[in-house]
Amino acid sequence: MSAEEKKSGRVYDVEPSQLYAEFMKTGWAPSPLHGITPDDVATYAFSRRQALSAAFPGMRLILPSGNYKVRSNDTDYLYRPHSAFAYYTGVQGVEATADAVLVMEPSGDSHEPILFINPRSTRDTDAFYKDARYGELWVGRRFTLEEAQARYQIATRKISELEAFLAKDKGALVIRNQDT
């Protein structure tokens, strides 16, 4: 078993031919989302984050959304984010994606909220059609970083940047058993 197979857990996937891989990256119509407005819950989530910030001054707060729960082999249960994550971000329902993290970064006497997400997989990469967990072909369109920021009124970054961001040790409070 190769390292890639171990990583994905899908040993039955066959590597596509180069011709097929190139074909899958072409011919897709653009699918921009126009007129994204802030979610109605964004105002409430902002107030909740303010109260949370006041309760933990100077502490970095980490609220993971949780991850998928496997039902059988490669079939997952319907995803539901951790309640605290949904409460403080407003991200819920079909817009919620697994493995996201809200970090409340201390900034003076308050906090700066940063939402780390797996952004939309662009169609010019293999992830678009090969990644069964996050690829758009398999699971549908997700928000780009800009779209998520417009929708939830929270600064957003790629989840791949989280580890480096947290490397600056500031002491943190984390909701356990939800982090991946």
Name these PLM-found stretches.
Residues M1-T180:
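A composition/biophysics-driven feature that prefers long, compositionally simple stretches
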